[in-house]
Amino acid sequence: MDIHQYKIMLVDDNHDLSEMIAGILRQSGYENIVTAGSVAEALDVFHRELPDMALLDVMLPDGDGFRLFQKLREKSQIPILFLSAKDEDRDRLFGLGLGADDYITKPFLPPELVLRIS
């Protein structure tokens, strides 16, 4: 699939960070970015937009990204990556153990993010 058509769902409650990440992705050719700031909003966006990939923050205002991952995984096998400031090995290993495709800790370098989602 051409990356211009690839739809990425970005879930993070920090609006400024979401906009920055979306900008990085758009500059790299990923033009179709949809965002959500909570678990509830992410589930709605997921059902409405049917993304090809999801990037999930671990800490969200109405739940955590791990539970969201499990709900999304029940419905789809799209690639799902965690983006989190929680950099403890146990969190990273837990996320990967659930079946996440990657666990990227914040802060990250923009080229690293693009490389790891491609």
Model regions and ranges:
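Acidic catalytic/metal-coordinating carboxylates
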Residues: S38, D64-R67
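Two-component/phosphorelay signaling modules centered on CheY-like receiver
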Residues: H15-V34
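Active-site residues of response regulator receiver
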Residues: D57, S84
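The feature encodes the CheY-like receiver
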Residues: P61, E88, K106
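Conserved acidic carboxylate
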Residues: D12, L60
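Acidic, metal-coordinating helix/loop segments flanking the phosphotransfer/catalytic sites
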Residues: T35-M53
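Short amphipathic alpha-helix used as the core "switch/output" element in two-component signaling
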Residues: D44, F66-S76
